[in-house]
Amino acid sequence: MTSLEQVRQLSKIDQIQIAGLIFGSEQRAKEVKQFLADCEKIPEVQTNADFYNWSRKKQFLSKDKQGFSFMKMINNQVDDMEQYTGPMIYSATTNHYGVYLAMVVPALKILGTQEQINAWLDDLIQIRKAACYAQTELGHGSDIQSLQTTATYDKGTQEFVINTPTIQAAKFWPGDLGILANWALVFAQLIVDGTNYGVQSFMVQIRDEQTHKPLKGIEVGDIGPKMGYQVKDNGFLKFDNVRIPKFNMLAKYISISPQGKVMKEGDPKISYASMMMMRKLLNTVYPKAAAISLTIALRYSYTRQQFTNDKGVENSVIEYQTQQHKLLPLLANLFAVVLSGNVTSKFVDLNFTEVQKGNFSHMNACHSLLCGTKANYTHFVVNCAEWCRLSCGGHGYAHYSGLPSIYQEHSPNVTLEGENQIMFLQLARYLLKLLKTSQKNPEKIPEQFSLFKRINEILSFKCDQFQTSNILSLLESSVIHLITQTGMKMMQEIQGGMNPKAAWDYKLGTSLWESANYFIEYYKFVCFQNTILLVTHKQTQVVLTNLLNLFGVTILLQNPLALLENDVITQQTMKQLRDEYENLLNLIKPEALSLVESFCLADGGLRTTIGRADGKPYEYTYDWAVNENSLNKIDFSNTVNQLKNCRPKL
């Protein structure tokens, strides 16, 4: 069996520098590594080895204790989203209160007046009030503007009357709602004097803070078991003429006079602020779950030996090109996702800093970019978990590998906070607007979309002889060809008599999706490339450049149609791309373990028997089956005898 330590000793990269890129700075990487090391010593934050044999109720209660232990470890700095990194990496499942701390608190800080912040923020942070983010309804999710819950202003009492007028209007799916929350940030249609002023947000108490019983007019509970998120109390909520004070509508950008005059200011997209902050979290913290999958799968691939070579020695499965093909492009994509996520995070912070000053100029670009990255990144994490599971054979199928839980716990992210197809369509809409802007006002195109300033130059690019220096130009060419063809297709449908909305909905969906997704792949490449420029260690820069090129070549090979259709490349170029792909697999294989271990993950957070740091998969797996699996400690003799008696007699 290949020793993991031998593989590590052969590595030539500087893991400290790489960890600094991953976590934003070497100091932050050191803090996360120390946090994860501290977790190894605290029993309360460990996930029990027999966790997946437990009932949902027992799992829920254990995670409640774990969540509070994590909060103690971060000194209750729950309003600092960076502090979530350690707990989310270490925990096997989603954490209690995570949704409301990541969404309700930011919403209050961005959408609330100072008086409202003073009234609620401290209680929320200290969890004296536990609030859920009650937006999604039984009948509507991504289509926020069609929500049916109503908040009708009563001028006589200076109150809002909250109602769910239909069964479809019932809030359904909000996390922390089913059991834990006693307050809800409710999104409802604002009705004043019979006029609908659109969806606004309201702080509504739903349970008594002492008895935890539902208040009058409230029907609330848990929606039941799910594919993943078993310890998350996703809930349902109905209102029957529930009255709340006028003060409870978050009112920094909208207000109502006592007489019922409605006044709005700022960008309408500001109402999506908390969703944007949650998408930032999905961009920066959750992708590190893919590092867990790859750490397990790569360690196992170095230690697992199958079939002999020509010298009669068993090969580590990582030596096989098919195994490299499964895992190394995922490793390259992981770095592209994480490093571009860091860049996006800074843009989000800049946007909301400017919003607080009354400057909304970055809002559209920020919202659109977050839509696309959220869709691309969350799909990647789930896809990565599945391929890592497959790469570990039968062991990958078992919970003791640590891989099934990653797939289950991150699958919901593909749908929550904006279903991924809808998210790509929102980005595509913005890209088409940029196409028009490029013709009239190219100076107004944001930096993150600057390739739209060079459309003619990009459209004229041809590549007869592939070199790695051409990867960026080829990605740019794919993006611009796809979006311009989509724009022309839309014009043709409109000129043929179809209205724009019908063309969008029924004729352009796949083209729009492909354009948006490809733009994000290009964006990831650019961010990855720019981040490598910060590396000072020469060999590390070489290895990361190889990893970057593998990412780029993989994208080009997976999606070459736009380049071939527009004669940007030839069949010979495609062959050169395939040859370079195989060459890059060979170059990256010796460094793959050290690259993924730059994420500083601790064994307890991996929750695996097959991918631990000391490389003893068989010892840990057998020990778990013999000593930890509670099913083996139950006497089933009576059950077996009863089954014998039930067998048909021939």
What are the roles of these predicted feature ranges?
Residues M1-L650:
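Flavin-dependent oxidoreductase catalytic core characteristic
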